[in-house]
Every structure is written in C-alpha cells, then in structure tokens.
Amino acid sequence: MDDLCARFLLNIPDSERLDMIRLMFQIELAHWFYIDFYRVEDKNLPEMRLPQFAARIFHAYPFLIHGDETSVSVLISNWKEYKKEVPTFGAIIMDKKMTHCILVQGNSERASWGFPKGKVNIDESPEKCAAREVLEEVGYDVSPLMDKKNFIEVDLAGQINRLYLCPGCPLKTEFVTQTRNEISNIKWFPIDALPLFAPPFVSAIAT
C-alpha cells in the first residue's frame, strides 16, 4: 500500500492532492494498478472493491482527507455523482464503405457491446480524449480518420456523450486492446444489424 500511495498519491501536485474529487480519481488509478499488477503477481493479496480500497488508504494516510467532510462513504458518493457529469468522448470506427463499425465488449460477466469511448481528463480536448480512449481500448490510432466537426453528440441524463464518425478503417485491421481486465472482445458489426444498446447513436449512423 505504501508503494501505491507513493506512486499515485503522495507526490502529485497540491492542486490534485487538496481537491478531494481529483484525489479520488488518483485513488481509482491506484486501485486499477492494484488489481492489474499487484494481485496478478501475488494471489494472496485480498480482493478489494474501490470503497474498501479507498477506506484503507484514508486509514493509513488520514492527512489526505481535506475539507469538512471526513466520511469515506460520503466522499466516494460525492465523487461518483461528479463522475456522472463528466463528458465522455469516443469514436465510431467504420470501414471505407461505411457498412460496418467496431464495437467493444467489457470484461464483466454481463458486459454489453458498445462503442470505444471514455471520460475526458482535466484540460484534455474532446478529440484528444476520443483518440486516447480508442487507442487504449482497441489499439488503433483513429486520429488520421477524425474530423473534429463530424460527430454525434447526445445528452444522457445530464452527461454529454460524443462519438466522432471515423470512416476509412480497413476491415482486415487487427485490433488489440491496450487495457487490462477492461475489454474482452473487439468486433466488426454490420451497421444495419447493430445491437440495440444505444438507440441515439445507432439511429444516427444508420440513416
């Protein structure tokens, strides 16, 4: 735990360490690192969900908590509410004829299919976020295919979701996720036979 805190929490700028929302994002990164590397190398380490992991960190380093609120559960709840409003950006990767597009499937047992996308980082532009998330999830640099003005954007319960339309990807492209324990499947789907998981996006690209 000390090594994780030194890597992700203790040496970050004060602007992030003193802001509980930003600090929680760093704790989330530390939690992913714990799952992806520490527990893979040492099976005896306990499995911990984020709330339990955060509680252990705050117990070991109570000086990390700033402000009037000291309840870990409330801090996590506030952070989760904030995350719901963070915009997400990604891409609809299509072949040259625009008859097929790429979908990804999460790693959980009941994961559905979706377009590669993710939450924007602080001070990150929408198009850079989209390119970064796509590269992480499918291992493909979509930047050369991206037109900053060509996108579909929907507001889902107060959260902006934008997908850039990126035609021109060869169907023979080999996609390999750069993530760990996040993406289980990457597959081309015919646009006229997409799963009905996101009607606003599906209807927009099918017309």
State where each predicted segment sits.
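N-terminal leader/linker segments that precede catalytic domains of diphosphate-processing enzymes
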Residues: 1-112, 119-132, 140-174, 183, ...
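Extended, charge-rich, solvent-exposed interface segments
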Residues: 178
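Long, compositionally biased charged/polar stretches
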Residues: 196-199
